């Protein structure tokens, strides 16, 4: 069975296993390797010297730059060749020398990356990470195993995120930071150790948050970080804000639910 679409363009120096599934108008550039269990969606481009292996699915319209290693075995000494996967969505830009690993059986066996993300050069997404949509990982960012990066989060260059940590939606982590606890949604933080520095106001405005949502989130942030309340007391106050700011109920719910679900604790 031939799984390579006739419109796909494969450079003569590339090595593509005949069992791989290659979609319409895919470009596989010079010296790339595509393994037997790989599925590549329509119009995805592998520039050159790209490795895609393991049980990996790349969606449509992705662009992968030289030196990237996609779907390689996890950097986990417990890994023993189990059948685990990497699933990547659509329209991602994966720059030079990025590494995205398959999952492990110690978690759900899947590393999942959404769509419309930008992975700058040398970024690392370890096993069992969950990366949402519209995120940015700047140069040399390293996500350890089991990290969750929610939609539209931004992580600055040279930053490391400890295993099992979560970075919330629309949060921004400054460069050269060390994230060892959860970063709540909508927050800006920096440092080693990473500490909060208020809301990501510029990012929220750019994302179209309205005035009521911004005011409500300021109050929620204050309850969590500035009023010397326990987490339980802060969550009660955040819940009460939904009555005062009904248009902000959704973002307040997400903020509160994220805080309540934290097992590693929050940055402080």
Where is each model-derived feature located?
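Terminal amphipathic alpha-helical/low-complexity segments used for targeting or macromolecular assembly
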Residues: 1-13, 18-19, 25, 61, ...
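Structural signal for interior beta-strand "rungs" in well-ordered beta-sheet cores
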Residues: 3-190, 194-195
């Amino acid at each position: 069975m031939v799984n390579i679409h006739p419109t796909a363009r494969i450079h003569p120096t590339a090595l593509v296993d005949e069992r791989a599934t290659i979609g319409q108008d895919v470009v596989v550039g010079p010296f790339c390797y595509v393994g037997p269990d790989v599925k590549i969606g329509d119009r995805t481009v592998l520039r050159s010297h790209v490795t895609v292996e393991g049980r990996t699915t790349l969606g449509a319209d992705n662009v992968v730059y030289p030196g990237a290693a996609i779907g390689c075995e996890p950097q986990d000494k417990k890994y023993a060749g189990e059948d685990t996967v990497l699933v990547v969505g659509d329209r991602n830009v994966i720059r030079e020398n990025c590494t995205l690993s398959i999952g492990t059986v110690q978690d759900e066996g899947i590393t999942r990356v959404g769509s419309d993300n930008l992975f700058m050069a040398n970024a690392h997404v370890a096993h069992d990470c969950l990366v949402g949509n519209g995120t940015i990982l700047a140069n040399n960012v390293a996500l350890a195993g089991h990290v969750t990066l929610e939609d539209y989060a931004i992580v600055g260059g040279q930053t490391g995120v400890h295993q099992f940590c979560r970075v919330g939606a629309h949060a921004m982590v400054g460069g050269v930071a060390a994230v060892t606890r959860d970063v709540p949604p909508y927050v800006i933080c920096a440092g080693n150790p990473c500490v909060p520095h208020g809301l990501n106001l510029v990012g929220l405005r750019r994302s179209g948050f309205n005035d009521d949502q911004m005011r409500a989130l300021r109050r929620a942030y204050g309850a969590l970080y500035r009023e010397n309340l326990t987490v339980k007391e802060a969550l009660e106050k955040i819940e009460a804000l939904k009555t005062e700011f009904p248009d902000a109920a959704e973002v307040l719910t997400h903020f509160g639910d994220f805080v309540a679900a934290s097992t590693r604790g929050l940055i402080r």
